[in-house]
Amino acid sequence: MVVVVVSSLIMEPAARAENEADIAEDIRFGDFNILAYRDSNNISPTTWYEPDNRSQAIPRIIKDNDWDVVNLQEVQTAFRRKDGSMTPSQIEDMRASADLSAYDFAATDKEGCNFSTSNPMPKIWMQPILYKSDKFALVTQGCFVMSQTPNDFSETSFGWPRNITSWARLRSKANSGEFYVFNTHIAANYGPIGGGGGGVPRQEWLNHQVDQANVLISQIKVINDENLPMMLSGDFNSTFETTPVSAAGTVLDSGLFIDSYNSAETVLTDGPTWNQLVEHGRFTGKIDHILIGEENSPVVTEYAVVPTMRKDADGTLHFASDHNAVSTHVILHWAPPEA
């Protein structure tokens, strides 16, 4: 497995803060679409167990990169096949992994944040937020649908399969500073429910993505009404350059966030975030993004695209996911408490 580990920078906090009295903390954020289990993709190079062992590779990537907080997309519970047998449970395999023993999980099925893409499909999907339990305490958590009625999980996303955003408010055990983490997944081009899943013309799909992005922006404003530091990441299924409209660009243009890639002082490793399950794909863009709340003068010191492919000596390829992970090292600031 090729793993990129984000290195620490040694620095004086006062050199980074606008005001020497500011409270600051270095945090490593990660984002990873792990590729939902399907029987159709449980073949090489993406088997969940042997021989590709995605169930072990994914936790190892998280541990080796030493993320303090990591957002995951496309995580599933077990579901019943037509023959009555059960599929593996990605979430339970991850909870049981020794490589993830340092993490607590927020916004999962245990908190009612599992969902179905459409009714009456089973509620097997979730977007967990993992955080190091020795560094942070969970204050509150939740999730919403990117739709006209965000708190109604019986509703679709504007007539399309449901897409959600999960979120958590965390408190630093080092300085008691609190911040929000938002974890999103914008629609792929499956088309409206009842359309057979074959997709729609590109413009219609992009417009739907922007509808979801606008809900995302409005809900973030409602939830983080105190303007605390925050991170938003996920699979946006769009680059900032996607034309004629871009969901990722719409969120960035809201003025709430800075992009960690374009703001980073150092880019350790670059490349596409969708690997297409090939060693050298034609797609070179980034559809997975880590955005940092613009308020409170955050500093992005490092950024990296983390490859999720490993190659055996005989040339055999194994993929933990069809996405590469994204990693960033950020210094968050809080205003000092009033005297």
Feature map (PLM): residue ranges:
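N-terminal, active-site-proximal structural segment of metallo-dependent hydrolase catalytic domains
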Residues: 2, 6, 10-100, 110-121, ...
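Extracellular/periplasmic catalytic domains that process cell-envelope and extracellular macromolecules
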Residues: 21-25, 62-64, 96-100, 120-124, ...
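Active-site beta-strand/loop signature of hydrolases that rely on acidic residues for catalysis
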Residues: 29-34, 58-87, 130, 168, ...
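Acidic/histidine-rich helix-loop elements
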Residues: 31-55, 150-159, 187-208
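Active-site environment of divalent metal-dependent phosphoester hydrolases
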Residues: 38, 77-80, 114, 189-190, ...
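Extracytoplasmic/secreted proteins, especially bacterial periplasmic and envelope-associated proteins
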Residues: 53-61, 86-89, 93, 125, ...
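Structured beta-strand-rich core segments of catalytic domains in phosphoester-bond hydrolases
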Residues: 75-187, 305
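Metal-dependent phosphoester-hydrolase catalytic domains
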Residues: 220-231, 238-339
